[in-house]
Design a protein with these regions (language model features):
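Residue-level signal for inorganic ion chemistry
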Residues: 53, 70
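Histidine-centered, metal-coordinating catalytic motifs and their short helical/loop contexts
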Residues: 67
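Hydrophobic alpha-helical transmembrane segments
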Residues: 2-48, 59, 63, 71, ...
Length: 109
C-alpha cells in the first residue's frame, strides 16, 4: 500500500503520532483499545480500497465513469473511517492534553 497509495503515508504518519502520544500520555488499557481499534479500522479500509482499485483497474483498464464512481465510493469509505478515528482520538486524548495544558501554564485552571 505504501508503494502506491499516497494517503497510506499520511495514515502511517498519523499512526506513529497516535502511538507516540499514547506512550507519552500513559494511556489506560481501555484507551489503548480504542486507539488500536481506530488505527486498525483505518488501515483495513485503506487496504480494501487499494485492493478494490487494483481489481477495478484490472477489470477495466480504460476509463469508465462507473469504475471512477466505484473508486470514489471506496475512497469515501476510507475518509469516513479516518474521520471516525479522528473523533475517537480526540475523545481519548483531549483529557490528557487538557491536563497537560493546565499543569504547564494554567490555561485551563
Amino acid at each position: 500500500m505504501l508503494r502506491c497509495q499516497h494517503n497510506a503515508w499520511i495514515h502511517l504518519g498519523l499512526t506513529i503520532v497516535a502511538i507516540g502520544a499514547g506512550f507519552f500520555f500513559g494511556l489506560s488499557s481501555r484507551e489503548w483499545c480504542w486507539i488500536i481499534l481506530a488505527i486498525a479500522i483505518v488501515w483495513t479500509a485503506e487496504a480494501l480500497n487499494t485492493a478494490f482499485e487494483f481489481l477495478a483497474d484490472a477489470a477495466s483498464p480504460e476509463f469508465h465513469p462507473l469504475v471512477r464512481d466505484a473508486k470514489d465510493v471506496a475512497a469515501g469509505a476510507v475518509l469516513i473511517t479516518a474521520i471516525a478515528a479522528t473523533i475517537i482520538a480526540a475523545i481519548v486524548f483531549w483529557p490528557h492534553v487538557a491536563e497537560l495544558l493546565k499543569w504547564s501554564n494554567g490555561v485551563l485552571e
